[in-house]
């Protein structure tokens, strides 16, 4: 369809005026459109609003200091780590890892050998990886995530 112009298409011309307030501070006119006082006060008000609306720093407590033992470091905290962390130690996940998580908390790494139902192979794995474990104070905020931390591949 071609563009058709002419009397068949009524058009209404609307004259709109745009209110403009140019700032003529250094012009040769005697009367500026915006006074210096108005310009400075509006600039000062905008700067004050920007300063007052700035975000304050968070006053949250520091995250769990031993977070590296939850899977991000070389050692695994047997009282707080998730069952999936043991997957990086061949033979531990899921059976032996599940037993460790289910039977905690432990006062020491040596308490792992007292888990009921351990067979010789599992005891051998515990001995093999004993230096990879640490038994820290159990934290209630990690208790719920021990079996299912909600991270899926």
Curated annotation (Swiss-Prot):
Q: State the annotated membrane topology for this chain.
A: Peripheral membrane protein
Q: What is its main location?
A: plastid
Name a GO CC annotation attached to this entry: photosystem II
The UniProt PTM text for this protein says:
Predicted to be translocated into the thylakoid lumen by the Tat system. The position of the transit peptide cleavages have not been experimentally proven.
Q: Which Gene3D superfamilies match?
A: Photosystem II 12 kDa extrinsic protein
Q: Which UniProt keywords apply?
A: Chloroplast, Electron transport, Membrane, Photosynthesis, Photosystem II, Plastid, Thylakoid, Transit peptide, Transport
Q: In its UniProt record, which GO terms are filed under biological process? A: photosynthesis; photosystem II stabilization
- What Pfam families does this protein map onto? PsbU
What does the UniProt function comment say about this protein? One of the extrinsic, lumenal subunits of photosystem II (PSII). PSII is a light-driven water plastoquinone oxidoreductase, using light energy to abstract electrons from H(2)O, generating a proton gradient subsequently used for ATP formation. The extrinsic proteins stabilize the structure of photosystem II oxygen-evolving complex (OEC), the ion environment of oxygen evolution and protect the OEC against heat-induced inactivation.
Q: What is the protein name given in its UniProt record? A: Photosystem II extrinsic protein U, chloroplastic
């Amino acid at each position: 369809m071609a563009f058709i112009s002419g009397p068949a298409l009524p058009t209404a011309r609307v004259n709109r005026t745009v209110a403009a307030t140019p700032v003529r501070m250094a012009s040769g006119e005697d009367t500026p459109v915006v006074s210096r006082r108005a310009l400075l006060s509006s600039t000062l008000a905008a700067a004050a609003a920007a300063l007052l609306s700035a975000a304050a720093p968070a006053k949250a407590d520091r995250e769990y200091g031993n977070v590296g033992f939850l899977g991000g470091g070389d050692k695994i905290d047997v009282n707080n780590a998730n069952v999936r962390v043991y997957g990086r130690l061949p033979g531990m996940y899921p059976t032996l890892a599940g037993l460790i998580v289910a039977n905690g908390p432990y006062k020491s790494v040596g308490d792992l050998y007292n888990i009921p139902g351990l067979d010789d192979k599992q005891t051998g794995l515990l001995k093999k990886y004993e230096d990879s474990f640490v038994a820290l104070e159990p934290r209630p905020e990690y208790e719920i995530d021990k079996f299912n931390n909600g991270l899926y591949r």
